[in-house]
């Protein structure tokens, strides 16, 4: 038995769908999102270091890719991706399943962007608790020092030298950044979808456009907090003594302001947006595609 696109509620899995359906769709989207633009994310991390590492890259993303590839090898742009893959799949599975749970509980919909934003904030708070240690390892691996042989070696070295707290020192900042980022992203996404896909039919183009726009807007507005997060997560590897002495977000904020004023809070904004637009578009499109596949499988099995 076949089904037309309009026979499926593309925006949601069937009522009563098992949690693993949301987990699988979320994991699929998370791995794709973080893998597609990983080299550009590595450039963004270096730009935000505010030391000699940041001078190894330029404001031009293409030139930075060419320079790093020629001096350090192409592989250096992908160092740490194993940590992202290990963390992104489960964390996005958690994020999307929690998002769908809260959206159903508070009746979030495209015409209620504030409810969607609240659901997104709840979801990211929980998923970031899982992802933050993996992000710390990723950013340490993205630096050119080569002091870590692998993601596992990085994790054990950081734990031995800096303790468990090093993996979570940036968590409050991550939440302070991720909640507005996700709230803006989800609200913008749902608002765009209400215009581009008002009938909620299977339309990947609308998911890609809405996802890209929501990612660009959310990433640009939250870049200052991302700079703070990067310095916190890499402080143990920083060549700047003042950074290594920072004990929390406020210390880092003061250092950044004294270092270069307001412009320093927007270091890496271009690569951050370049990463966020396609990554968010891929994330939403992959998640919605995963849901659509699971819906079809469910419908077929019930036929």
From Swiss-Prot:
- List the subcellular locations: Mitochondrion inner membrane
Transmembrane spans: 12-32, 81-101, 117-137, 174-194, 208-228, 265-286
- List the keywords (alphabetical): Membrane, Mitochondrion, Mitochondrion inner membrane, Repeat, Transmembrane, Transmembrane helix, Transport
**Sequence ranges of the Solcar repeats:** 17-105, 111-195, 206-293
Q: What is its main location?
A: mitochondrion
Which biological processes are named by the entry's GO terms?
A: iron import into the mitochondrion
Entry-linked InterPro entries: Mit_carrier (IPR002067), Mitochondrial_sb/sol_carrier (IPR018108), Mt_carrier_dom_sf (IPR023395)
Q: Please name one Pfam family that this protein belongs to.
A: Mito_carr
Provide GO CC annotations from the record.
mitochondrial inner membrane; mitochondrial membrane
Top-rank taxon, per record? Eukaryota
> Per UniProt, what is the membrane topology?
Multi-pass membrane protein
Q: Which PROSITE patterns match?
A: SOLCAR
- GO molecular function annotations of the record: ferrous iron transmembrane transporter activity
The similarity annotation says: Belongs to the mitochondrial carrier (TC 2.A.29) family.
This protein is called Uncharacterized mitochondrial carrier C8C9.12c
* Originating species: Schizosaccharomyces pombe (strain 972 / ATCC 24843) (Fission yeast)
